[in-house]
Regions:
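Cytosolic catalytic domains that perform sulfur/thiol-centered chemistry
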Residues: 1-265
């Protein structure tokens, strides 16, 4: 099963998760959800739900096992549920939720390419009704092979582990020419660069030649960005393209620079 699905092909019997968000206006996504969402959809907030904002391991740190288990139980999910995730389209937030679900062990999950507006155009029912969810109990099947820690990345930089570090930020940030968010400019040493927005096309995310030419399928890949958010769509696109050994360094550059130097070029 692929990662991305067209809105016209979505099963209406699926469980929908609404991941709309705006990094510049953090209330926007929930406000949009409250105004109108796919019937029965449950809202997942980037910072309140799929980041541990109390941690110091980056700007959008990885939640703990306990936090993720409690989140998906509160959302009323089971590991074998068919789950459809959407955001506003051409955004990284549905991919972030996809990654967390995959990490916990959910196996039947897809992202709507084109997001909420595509689902509306496809005729799925929309309303503003509150959704009553019965909490579940799940036993996670942790997929540790999807996660890279700072120590894992250091082993790659030092040449002790063979893998490609892939920086999903724009080229100017990768090269260290500008840095609007973090206290140090540059990139993790040895990293290659593929700006995630190259994959945006007409409100969708697509696998591009630039991506598949930057890293080959026989290379293990660890994707990172500034805080682990925009690395997520590169992860999902690589999985869509059939890459098997792909991890996300969720702490990303904002975590790396707390301990190690950055490279510039």
């Amino acid at each position: 099963m692929g990662v991305f699905v067209e809105a016209a092909d979505v099963s209406r019997d699926a469980i929908f998760l609404d991941a709309r968000y705006n990094l510049q206006n953090k209330q926007w996504g929930k406000e949009q959800y409250d105004a109108a969402h796919i019937h029965g959809a449950r809202y997942v907030d980037l910072e309140q739900d799929v980041s541990d904002m109390t941690s110091n391991r980056g700007r959008h740190p990885m939640p703990s096992h306990e936090q993720l288990q409690q989140l998906f139980q509160r959302l009323g999910l089971q590991l074998d549920d068919h789950i459809v995730i959407y955001d506003q389209g051409g955004a990284p937030f549905a991919s972030r939720v996809y990654y967390m679900l995959a990490y916990v062990g959910f196996t039947n999950i897809v992202i709507v390419n084109g997001g909420f507006s595509a689902l509306v155009a496809a005729g799925l029912p929309v309303n503003a009704e509150a959704v009553n969810v019965t909490p579940t109990t799940i036993t996670p099947n942790w997929q540790a092979q999807l996660y890279a820690s700072r120590e894992d990345v250091k082993a790659i930089v030092d040449g002790n582990v063979q893998a490609v570090l892939l920086d999903a930020r724009e080229e100017a940030r990768y090269r260290g020419e500008v840095e609007p968010l973090d206290k140090v400019a540059g990139h993790i040493p040895t990293a290659r660069n593929y700006f995630w927005e190259q994959a945006k096309k007409d409100g969708k995310l697509v696998v591009t030649d630039a991506l598949t030419q930057t890293v080959s399928k026989d290379e293990p890949v660890v994707v990172y960005c500034g805080s682990g958010v925009t690395a997520s769509p590169v992860f999902t696109l690589l999985k869509e393209a059939g890459y098997e050994d792909v991890k996300v360094y969720v702490g990303s550059f904002s975590d790396w620079i707390e301990a190690y130097d950055a490279a510039k070029k």
